[in-house]
């Protein structure tokens, strides 16, 4: 399938893309958190931020920016530390609000949808490993002798985005159903938010220690 467009072993790629999307990460966790705290609208706004951020990174990977980042340690480190700092900021903010026992119910009635989208977009864009991954993964399924490798790259990128959309939609819908139950169990909600905050801090530490 899509062999005429320079795509090699498309079905193998699709299976690989599914497994990759299923691996939990900060983007997935952020979408799930917002679907629980702000409903389906908040979840899909977070997902849109992730999709746009990923699309930008994929385009940059195709444009050759990945090679620049890989061969320029300073640039890689700048993006890496910015991403780690932002993850730490999000995690600390969640933990502070949870431990402080702020009036989350009042805030949940009027979610800041614009802020959700912006945070998801920044979270996606400040992951230097993602752009390097796209190149290393996609290149295995592109015929370098094809006349238009850009089309091949576009097909693979679109497939990955569609798989991600399906999975995130499942999480968003599930999170929206869980919302009503969580709101009646304040202790459970507090524990859940604390775990999410700690996971973001953990993601920050991991990103800060990554090597190019």
Swiss-Prot record:
The keyword Transport applies. One of its GO terms (cellular component) is plasma membrane. One of its GO terms (molecular function) is L-leucine transmembrane transporter activity. Keywords: Amino-acid transport, Antiport, Cell inner membrane, Cell membrane, Membrane, Transmembrane, Transmembrane helix, Transport. The chain crosses the membrane at residues 12-32, 49-69, 71-91, 122-142, 153-173, 188-208. It is a multi-pass membrane protein. It holds the Pfam family LysE. It catalyses: L-leucine(in) + H(+)(out) = L-leucine(out) + H(+)(in). Exporter of leucine. Belongs to the Rht family. This is Leucine efflux protein.
